[in-house]
Amino acid sequence: MARFSSKNLTKLFQYLVLSLLSPVAFGNFNIEVDTRNKVLNDAAINFYGQNIGIITDGERRVFGITDGPLKEACSKVQGGKPGYVWVRSPTPANLYEIHNWRQVLRVLTAYDARIVGIEQKPEMVATQTYKNRSDHPAKVSGMITQSVSNTIENKWIEMNQFSITATVSCKVKAAEIGLSMGYERSWGKEDTNSTTTMLGQQTGFEVELPPGGNCTAVLSATKGSMKIDVGYRATLEGDCAVDFPNTWNGHHYWCYPIGLVQDVGNLKKHIDCRELITIGYYSDAHVTIENLGKKKNKKTKKPPRKTKMN
């Protein structure tokens, strides 16, 4: 019967508990977008973050390294087919701890972020009519305002079965158009955030109207949409533990770097997923004056001219 020291029994118990709980994982992701001027596609995008966790059964399926494919791949490393393979603790005889082998880790990294689309179009936001009810010219001044919502939303594309406990933080700043917003969400969650802003607060006007005249003040703005594509890539690190039914070069237990096993077995080396962030915003508010002039009187129809009959 195998005997273990109290130290090894304690560590073995820790690995057993670990296997029953959620995998160890750490690391969050941050995306920062800062535009330098009103040309929004001339923006600096900073993205960073990494999340690492012991590989789960679901992630093994995503990478195609379940027992069958893994045994086949390991058999190509030295020529003998193993009876058992492992990628994490627990294992018989606590192989990873005793031999100081590395459990296979899923490493998820933010590796790419870019602007993929900007759309802008003019939009009439609000109107207001002013009248001069006096019988002499008069100056009319005013300010037309309207509250609107800037929005930021995210959607996940090609989402895979990664067991991630992390947050994704996104901050967007465009000082030239007065835009500053963001969000912090759990990995994989989709949502929409909005902030209310007031247009027209600095776009007052003054105009002279003739007696009985009127005008319409039109508050317009540019309604824009910016799309940002963020790429995340999952790779594997660590060692695959192998048990040969008969000794191989004098040993039953071996370990192979998981990257080597993936190479010789032609297995997936990485898995990608993407997050699409869409920012909706208003900018360049301005007021124009339309229909400036005296109110026209309605024309009255003259009665038909009577013709004298002989």
UniProtKB/Swiss-Prot annotation:
PTM description: Contains 3 disulfide bonds.
Places the protein is found: Secreted; Target cell membrane
CDD domains noted in UniProt: PFM_spherulin-2a-like
Presence of keyword Secreted: yes
GO molecular function: toxin activity
Signal peptide start-end: 1-27
Gene3D superfamilies: Proaerolysin, chain A, domain 3 (2.170.15.10)
Keywords attached to this entry: Disulfide bond, Membrane, Secreted, Signal, Target cell membrane, Target membrane, Toxin
GO cellular component, one term: other organism cell membrane
Tissue: Expressed by the venom apparatus.
Role description: May function as a large pore-forming protein.
Entry's family note: Belongs to the megalysin family.
Record protein name field: U-megalopygitoxin(8)-Mo15
